[in-house]
């Protein structure tokens, strides 16, 4: 379906719908009914949880993870966007505004791009390996850049009376059953109904930006 209007997209890394939202943003930039619609899609992606953009500020934390200064004037950006497209004040939200502003967790800073994924991003394929025993962190699951050969399948026993515990992550709207955000996953990784695939130790920092 064609996209018909300029838009300012607010997203959160720990929202349950971050993947589909960014896919829709990408769709809007390519399927606008005209150049105005296609060329005026803007996205801001912060490290907050669902609908918590207003919490972005100095000394920001998501779950257990300290992320430094994540300040973003959320309301101010909305007003400026409205001034440009609803009140014909182009100087309020100039055309030089970056198309995408996203918070890079790890180096803990806001970055900009004119597209998503960023132009410098390289699509990389990773493969799951094991000897058939990828269960828990004590298993033999590996994550590799090499395609697997003739390896046995991994399996686990599912017990609905004892489901896998969920700790953090992207979530919303569950009445507080799960608190979204970044949390230590070691309690989950020791259970045998979870498959774990771990890469070799990285020799240098790696930035992940794009669709996963």
Task: List each language-model region with its residue ranges.
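Active-site-proximal cap/loop segments of hydrolase catalytic domains
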Residues: 1-94
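C-terminal, loop-rich substrate-recognition/catalytic regions characterized by aromatic stacking residues
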Residues: 53, 59-212
